[in-house]
A protein has these predicted regions:
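Structural preference for beta-strand elements that scaffold enzyme active sites
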Residues: 1-3, 29-31, 45-48, 66-70, ...
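Glycine/Thr-rich beta-alpha phosphate-binding loop at enzyme active sites
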Residues: 41-51, 67-113
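N-terminal active-site wall of soluble small-molecule enzyme domains
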Residues: 1-63
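Glycine-rich phosphate-binding active-site loops on the catalytic face of alpha/beta enzymes
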Residues: 49-59, 89-104, 125-148
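Glycine-rich beta-to-alpha transition loops that act as phosphate-gripper elements at the mouths
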Residues: 29-36, 50-52, 70-79, 117-128, ...
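Conserved strand-to-helix beginnings and helix N-cap segments that scaffold or border functional pockets
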Residues: 12-17, 83, 102-105, 131
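Alpha-helix C-terminal capping segments
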Residues: 61-64, 82-84, 109-115, 133-136, ...
Length: 148
């Protein structure tokens, strides 16, 4: 699954369509961040709602059953917001990376049990701590540095 996230520049629809076609050829799902309306218009596989987006306007949109909505959260309030936004799964961070949103292993585990939504672990996952994910309630993990 590929999520296109670029908050610094205006969205280039032609580029999004190129990436969509590439993902389709390779058998990958392609989601657009923070723009559900455009994801629907361009017939993408879904959309990603970042933690700072509290909007529920998309609940009135007509979506196909296959349309995926993912969201991210760093605390219980944001998790509740993602549930109100009716996301299919929640990226919860940060499990290992010590940043401003650092949860740590035990707080992450506790928060992951406070929702019925599938949880995807995020933040500082490496070859060294990958096995620890078997000890928590998560569907899987995501990252950038892990795959570099």
């Amino acid at each position: 699954m590929i999520i296109y996230r670029n908050y610094d520049q205006k969205i280039d629809e032609k580029l999004i369509i190129k990436i969509k076609n590439y993902c389709k050829k390779k058998g990958n799902k392609f989601l657009l961040s923070n723009n559900i309306k455009l994801a629907i218009k361009l017939n993408l596989d879904g959309a990603y709602i970042p933690s700072f987006n509290k909007n529920t306007k998309h609940l009135s949109y007509s979506l196909t059953k296959k349309f995926i909505i993912l969201g991210s959260a760093h605390n219980i309030n944001e998790m509740n917001t993602k549930e109100l936004q009716n996301v299919n799964a929640i990226f919860l961070s940060s499990i290992f990376k010590k940043n401003k949103n650092f949860l740590g292993f035990y707080k992450f585990k506790l928060l992951s049990h406070l929702t019925k939504r599938p949880i995807i672990a995020l933040g500082g996952i490496s070859k060294n701590n990958l096995k620890k994910l078997n000890l928590i309630n998560c569907l899987g993990f995501a990252g950038m540095s892990f795959f570099e």
